[in-house]
Regions:
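Domain-level signature for proteins that mediate thiol-based redox and metal-cofactor handling
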Residues: 1-155
């Protein structure tokens, strides 16, 4: 198990240092700002849809290694998924962090985001890990409730 924890730690560090998905998206359909007042983490998520599929995502902002890595890995996990699939993955991630689900079969859909499983043991870091996930959840829920297709557009 220690070996797996090491792999997860390496993945988190790699994403926090390299921020593969930290960029500006041209022609984003949606944009949402997330802020964690407890530690000052702040992100802006951008989303590009192709029909009902997440074509691309990106983020900008600043924060601790956990929030930055969680955002980057979330983007990798959700790209290419339908909005419905993304909502299911988001729900599972939040439940994992809050210790509401431990079903290994259910957690498999998280792909690399499962690396944050042990964050639930660090109460001060839970909000950091969840920031991007709550932000994208808010963005997708706003889109559903209004149906305008142009919520908080970044253009």
């Amino acid at each position: 198990m220690d070996e797996l924890t090491d792999v997860y730690n390496e993945l988190i560090m790699e994403h926090s240092m390299n921020s593969y998905n930290k960029k500006k998206l041209e022609n984003a359909d949606y944009c949402e700002v997330g802020h964690n007042p407890n530690c000052g983490d702040e992100i802006t998520l951008q989303l590009k849809l192709n029909g009902n599929k997440i074509e691309d995502m990106a983020f900008s902002g600043h924060g601790c290694a956990i929030s930055q890595a969680s955002t980057s890995i979330m983007i990798d996990t959700l790209k290419g998924k339908t909005v419905e699939e993304a909502k299911e993955i988001i729900k599972t991630f939040i439940e994992m962090i809050k210790r509401e689900t431990t079903d290994e079969e259910e957690l498999k859909k998280l792909e690399d985001a499962i690396a944050f499983k042990n964050v639930s043991n660090m109460p001060a870091r839970v909000k950091c890990a969840l920031l991007a996930w709550h932000t994208i959840e808010d963005m997708l829920n706003k889109n559903d409730s209004t149906g305008t297709g142009n919520i908080n557009c970044c253009h």
